[in-house]
């Protein structure tokens, strides 16, 4: 699991966490390669744990970076929680890495960066389309969409 910031490249002044006009996206990466994303109002512990509680089963082993918003997951009942310390230039260790979700962030930012001027109200739909395409990257999306339309006609 990880969070990422989406929005205009750089505006004078604020950068990184708390950059004014950026949208915060929280992402979960399952070991089978599937991603779930959700736009969150902030990256505080309470907000992130609400999403985690709703989407992650208690017997899961959690891998994250060292962001303080992830502290206390074992106390909530999760089996194990491994961290990598990005702040200390650690991106993988013997038991943990979050390269899967980092790969999705790179894919999403590259894909969404090609669309100039996404309105904030439409960002959610573009993000979910990107999530869908990433989750079905090995499938024939055309055939998959035809199948979905046959099952649930408009």
Q: For each of these PLM feature ranges, what is it?
A:
Residues 1-154:
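Residue-level recognition of single "structural anchor" positions
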């Amino acid at each position: 699991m990880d969070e990422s910031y989406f929005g205009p490249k750089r505006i004078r002044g604020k950068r990184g966490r708390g950059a004014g006009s950026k949208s915060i996206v929280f992402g979960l990466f399952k070991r089978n390669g599937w991603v779930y994303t959700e736009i969150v109002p902030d990256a505080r512990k309470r907000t992130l744990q609400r999403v985690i509680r709703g989407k992650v089963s208690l017997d899961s082993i959690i891998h994250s970076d060292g962001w303080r918003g992830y502290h206390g997951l074992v106390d909530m009942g999760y089996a194990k929680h491994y961290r990598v310390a990005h702040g200390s230039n650690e991106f993988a260790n013997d038991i943990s890495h979050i390269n899967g979700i980092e790969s999705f962030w790179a894919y999403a930012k590259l894909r969404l960066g090609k669309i100039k001027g996404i309105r904030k109200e439409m960002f959610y739909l573009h993000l979910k389309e990107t999530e869908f395409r990433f989750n079905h990257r090995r499938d024939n999306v055309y055939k998959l969409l035809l199948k979905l339309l046959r099952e649930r006609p408009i």
